[in-house]
Swiss-Prot record:
<feature type="region of interest" description="N-(5'-phosphoribosyl)anthranilate isomerase">
    <location>
        <begin position="276"/>
        <end position="477"/>
    </location>
</feature>
<dbReference type="InterPro" id="IPR001240">
    <property type="entry name" value="PRAI_dom"/>
</dbReference>
<protein>
    <recommendedName>
        <fullName>Tryptophan biosynthesis protein TrpCF</fullName>
        <ecNumber>4.1.1.48</ecNumber>
        <ecNumber>5.3.1.24</ecNumber>
    </recommendedName>
</protein>
<comment type="similarity">
    <text>In the N-terminal section; belongs to the TrpC family.</text>
</comment>
<dbReference type="InterPro" id="IPR001468">
    <property type="entry name" value="Indole-3-GlycerolPSynthase_CS"/>
</dbReference>
<comment type="function">
    <text>Bifunctional enzyme that catalyzes two sequential steps of tryptophan biosynthetic pathway. The first reaction is catalyzed by the isomerase, coded by the TrpF domain; the second reaction is catalyzed by the synthase, coded by the TrpC domain.</text>
</comment>
<dbReference type="GO" id="GO:0000162">
    <property type="term" value="P:L-tryptophan biosynthetic process"/>
</dbReference>
<keyword id="KW-0413">Isomerase</keyword>
<comment type="similarity">
    <text>In the C-terminal section; belongs to the TrpF family.</text>
</comment>
<dbReference type="Pfam" id="PF00218">
    <property type="entry name" value="IGPS"/>
</dbReference>
<dbReference type="InterPro" id="IPR011060">
    <property type="entry name" value="RibuloseP-bd_barrel"/>
</dbReference>
<feature type="region of interest" description="Indole-3-glycerol phosphate synthase">
    <location>
        <begin position="13"/>
        <end position="275"/>
    </location>
</feature>
<dbReference type="Pfam" id="PF00697">
    <property type="entry name" value="PRAI"/>
</dbReference>
<keyword id="KW-0057">Aromatic amino acid biosynthesis</keyword>
<comment type="pathway">
    <text>Amino-acid biosynthesis; L-tryptophan biosynthesis; L-tryptophan from chorismate: step 4/5.</text>
</comment>
<comment type="subunit">
    <text>Monomer.</text>
</comment>
<dbReference type="InterPro" id="IPR013798">
    <property type="entry name" value="Indole-3-glycerol_P_synth_dom"/>
</dbReference>
Amino acid sequence: MMITQDFTKPIDSATVLQKIVLDKAQWVKAKEKEFPLSQFKQNIQNSDRSFYDALAKGTHQKPAYILECKKASPSKGLIRAEFNLEEIANVYKHYASAVSVLTDEKYFQGNFEFLPLVRDIVSQPVLCKDFMISEYQVYLARYYQVDAILLMLSVVNDETYRVLADLAHSLGMGVLTETSNEEEFERALALGAKIIGVNNRNLHDLTVDLNRVVELTKKYADCIPADVRIISESGIYNHKQIHQLQKVAHGFLIGSSLMGNQDLNNAVRSVIFGENKVCGLTRAQDVKIVYENGALYGGLIFAEHSKRSVSLRQAQELVTAAPLRFVGVFQNQEIDFIVKIASQLQLYAVQLHGAETEAFITALRQQLPKNTQIWKAISVNTEAQSAVDFTDDLNVDRYIFDSQTANQQGGTGKTFDWSLIPENLKHKIILAGGISPNNVEQAIAQGCLGLDLNSGVESSAGVKDQEKVRLVFNNIY
């Protein structure tokens, strides 16, 4: 079967997509002259990494992740000026089910030369993300060692799709079939697509609607075969979105939100695992365990009367054990002391767990390094029945809502009434107090930014229990 679809003529009244496809047809024509298929076809070998097997592992409970290498886009312009593929791939290899690489030159500043550079570093299948309209591009993608291609049903008709998909399969490659509306989703099902991507971005005007994947999967729920995997594409910026959409999607393709973050490793961890903290760390092996299980933050307690208090010397050893974002916990201590510890340990944040006033916080903010956040614990009595009375302080980046008993603030091992959490501040609240494997699912359901774990994952004060840590994080993501 030959492709008869003419890509040199406008595909519809679309603007951005139409222009990209018209330019792509010109690019293909020029590339074929510059590097004819006859020069490299005989050197092509089939892929030995299965894209389908890698994505088949994705479930609603444990989604698959296609993490993307993207320098720029039409909607955002330049996203990552320091586009170091070696650095990016060395992060992605620890978390991805597959790695996507943009190869469109004009609109995304991509290049086919990027593909083998990434594939040499990662063990996962590599996806060539481009506007595929010709057999030449499919051969070229495999020549550059990719394991899967993207076929967009907003671009190709059914005849073209079959030709390109069949060719990809004959070369051992998989296909990510992209849809963006009901008609395209129906076509994907009829074409027998194994991995169906739902692009939440409107390619005509570049707006994003995360409800698209929800609406399409619900409407066609009875038509989607059990072995087909649904991938949500575009618009994913945080773990809360993952948690909401994994009910309908088996995986996520994430690019722009990661590429725009200089701290790529923690950006990936934040999206996949959420913003969760394990506090009261006293042993290097525990720091490693909580990092490996998905914690983003590690809490080091400097409050004098805590059973989990550490010295500066101990803390200096702990912060080298794993690249957590470390948070120092202080209680009614002098500003000079807090600033000294924060500076020497290069803390990500200082957490105030005492009666620190707004004036104290303002003064602390002026003396702390600019990139060190201030977190404030709000202690809620375990017997409390009325709403928490406090005013949001703009100098506070995160609130820790924790349990308080008559004798103790924090580390009580008890929960408070979670219905008292202010709904309008959940986006900057981390929930603490008695969270354990037994109640972590209910804690997640409160919809806070993240969870703060301590005594609920310990075997004794300051000693984390590896199995409890594993059980909690298994429920979190």
